[in-house]
């Protein structure tokens, strides 16, 4: 258990990252630290929060958009019909490195969607993430911190709750973006995770930045190449 405290959570932050998060400076970002390793951002960023009013009859889907040769963005429309009761199978570690095979769109949220490659070998959907950023927790604000896994579980739980209460049309528009400092780095500085639902009774808006960092005595990471981090 554990999570990066503020001084460790900002380790990955550069001027370029701040610009992509639409934050003026590091001190402003620090004000958005949620106390559990990640940052609750003040608004959506490059995200269609009006999708449910603009595209009423949109069907469930999942897609990836690359950033050059790297995994970039995952987008999906989620419902009870897309979620799965387990996580994906396959290799969980970048061999010989500190990194997990992190994903943009997690199997537990889109595992029942046919036509989408959710395997850990899909380079458009897999990025190197630290064990903390990838996450082990299941609830917000615990000793595990607020990692990507925690937000995925939160969304899944809300979809399940809505379904149990016969809200069969409950939908969540979900977007996950790997934020890099520059085009030459292949390890993301963090994950920008955003979600909006068609019923705020079950799920409120989410716009959070999860830094791809370590915590503890040795927090250094070389973001140029995952192979340099053993």
Predicted regions and their residues:
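Long, non-catalytic terminal segments
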Residues: 1-53
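Domain-level detector of nuclease and nuclease-like folds
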Residues: 54-230
């Amino acid at each position: 258990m554990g999570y990066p405290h503020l001084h460790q959570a900002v380790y990955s932050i550069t001027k370029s990252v701040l610009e992509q998060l639409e934050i003026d400076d590091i001190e402003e970002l620090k004000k958005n630290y949620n106390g559990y390793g990640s940052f609750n951002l003040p608004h959506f960023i490059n995200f269609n929060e009006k999708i449910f009013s603009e595209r009423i009859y949109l069907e469930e889907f999942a897609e990836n958009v690359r950033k050059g040769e790297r995994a970039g963005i995952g987008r999906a429309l989620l419902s009870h019909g897309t979620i799965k009761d387990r996580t994906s199978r396959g290799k969980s570690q970048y061999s010989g490195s500190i990194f997990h095979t992190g994903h943009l769109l997690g199997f537990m949220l889109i595992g029942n969607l046919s036509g989408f490659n959710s395997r850990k070998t899909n380079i458009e959907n897999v990025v190197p993430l630290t064990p903390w950023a990838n996450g082990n927790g299941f609830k917000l604000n615990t000793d595990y911190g607020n990692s990507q896994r925690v937000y995925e579980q939160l969304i899944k739980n809300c979809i399940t709750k809505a379904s149990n209460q016969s809200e069969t049309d409950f939908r969540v528009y979900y977007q996950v973006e790997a934020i890099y400092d520059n085009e030459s780095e292949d390890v993301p500085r963090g994950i920008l995770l955003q979600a909006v639902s068609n019923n705020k009774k079950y799920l409120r808006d989410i716009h959070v930045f999860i830094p791809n960092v370590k915590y503890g005595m040795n927090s250094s990471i070389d973001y140029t190449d995952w192979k340099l981090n053993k």
